[in-house]
């Protein structure tokens, strides 16, 4: 089964779910139907794993807009498979978890699962797309589906605000990403990602290289919640917990990181990229970790924790970006180890953070609150959830015998090794190492503190909104499976490292022998500096979490947050955009037409200037006599007159006369079909206009605005000049192959003796079909307007 068939299967399952929207009997089974999608996807990607491990890839290419190199092009290589397995397997756990979390009576289940599968479909599209424009389409689809999932409980104000904020920020980043892709196309002449990577040196030598880096980083940073674009992620926690566990910890927030991985071979050729990504990641890491200690809502704690961990991964991607400059030698081993660590920690983070979110969802579902100030002693009521969240928090903190310890130690190893890299010196190495250590200490602090406050101590049921909470086993099953993998990966890391992570690393550095530089993950590397840093984090972190009352000091600090800045700028944007809309949308049709024609004129003039004007060597003008001259003069005079006349009936009549003059031109040019069509349409249109006057209100005649009329005349003359110029340019050469021979065989190809009928009914049949649909829709609109009667009464309006 190809990738196209897989994505088509996901669409089919979504369509089936849509049919259950109106069937109450089947609505409660929506989750079980939705489970088919991640099961099919997981089986497919696991089936492809042995082949990809050997360096092969699956490729599907369907030509589309070949002139612009926009094709439906998919490629499943090691990196795509790594992310696809995360998306499908975590998706399987989340969809099953959602069947236990959501109410079958009160929640609109089919709608939720359609949104969730739409997001899964979009994410798989991002990671398998081999065309930049195709990737952008899926990129924005994730923003749309994320918006729909966050606002799923649309009656809540927090859901509405969080959805709008996340949509605004991520779509802004998506537009920046599109601009970056367009610049890449300008430089390389291709949208194929594999071809772009092959031309990395050409891009690096271009004067657009730095703008390309900035635009792609904007796309990645907004999607992966990097400072200062992180503010949307905590507000997105208003979504149902399955959404938070899937989108905002394991998948969507990793899309930006995937983008950085995919274009490392190109972007890593710039030291600007390495510095920018590394320091933005480290700032995000420490910012998220410190802010997590200030929260009381468990999902808010995990949201800032996710921001911090994403920053950690991004910083490793930045540090490892130098592999593009040094693909061989001793330096390549350091870069390769750091990139490997980034992939390793990304996988670990998806597991322990998904388990943590699911645990929080169980507690919220059963107790009615996520406020750690109201929770205590829950290990007696939720023993399985206690173990799951405890081990997951310890793994996140980098405690031995859990997978997080291995990737955290590799992170420290990468930080201290930067002193050997040409982009860094001893001072920078010390700075980034200190930032990493401090952020890691706070990671342990908020993780252990949350477990202590929620699960340890005396159980106080009276403070809980819901009474008699319990822990259904099937509810805990997905998070328990994720938790079991945490120590398993610690003891057999190379099973995952060699079979899943190494193929992904090969795809990041296409054409390089990364097997020689990829590290062998070991639980013991001796007593070295990374181990010492890990021990410092553990000791200091536990002391702060269990012995020091740091919480009161953390919440005494009052700072003007970036959220306040966002809200202020959002209000200003809303104010000025409202002013702009009111200026443009003034309910004057001629104003809209004027603006449209002006923009069209500028685009056409710019295109003609860029293309250059050919040498004029021939001008073909049709033969004309007195009738043509008189008709042309009539059209010209009536056109000028229409600019100044204000009587509606007179304007309609004069407009009809112009239409009849066009009919005369068609007759003189021996086009009877066109003349007949023009005559009928002009007559019907004129009659409809006159009849409609009886239903229109009496509007006082407006005074003639000389400036406005002058603009109309100038725009009209400008369009006339442009059209005539285009006709003359078209006469100067055959830049495009002629289509006359194509129409010469019209009778044989279509059976139509009339060339116009052959064009409309066969050669451009689809275009004609859609034109007919437009007419039908317009007719329905007119029918509705003519038959609309104002409904009276409050009950009818409701």
Curated annotation (Swiss-Prot):
Signal peptide: none
Topology with respect to the bilayer: Multi-pass membrane protein
The keyword Cell membrane belongs to this UniProt entry's keyword annotation: yes
Pfam family of the protein (one): Proton_antipo_N
Keyword Membrane set for record: yes
Gene Ontology MF terms in the entry: antiporter activity
Spans traversing the lipid bilayer: 1-21, 33-53, 78-98, 109-129, 133-153, 167-187, 209-229, 241-261, 272-292, 300-320, 337-357, 381-401, 431-451, 472-492, 526-546, 593-613, 625-645, 649-669, 674-694, 710-730, 766-786
Entry-linked InterPro entries: CPA3_Na-H_Antiporter_A, MrpA_C/MbhD, MrpA_C/MbhE, ND/Mrp_TM, Proton_antipo_N
Annotated GO biological process: monoatomic ion transport
The entry's keywords: Antiport, Cell membrane, Ion transport, Membrane, Transmembrane, Transmembrane helix, Transport
GO-annotated cellular components: plasma membrane
Entry's localization field: Cell membrane
Assembly notes: May form a heterooligomeric complex that consists of seven subunits: mnhA2, mnhB2, mnhC2, mnhD2, mnhE2, mnhF2 and mnhG2.
NCBIfam families reported for this sequence: PRK12646.1
Similarity comment text for this entry: Belongs to the CPA3 antiporters (TC 2.A.63) subunit A family.
Protein name: Putative antiporter subunit mnhA2
Protein species of origin: Staphylococcus saprophyticus subsp. saprophyticus (strain ATCC 15305 / DSM 20229 / NCIMB 8711 / NCTC 7292 / S-41)
Taxonomic lineage: Bacteria, Bacillati, Bacillota, Bacilli, Bacillales
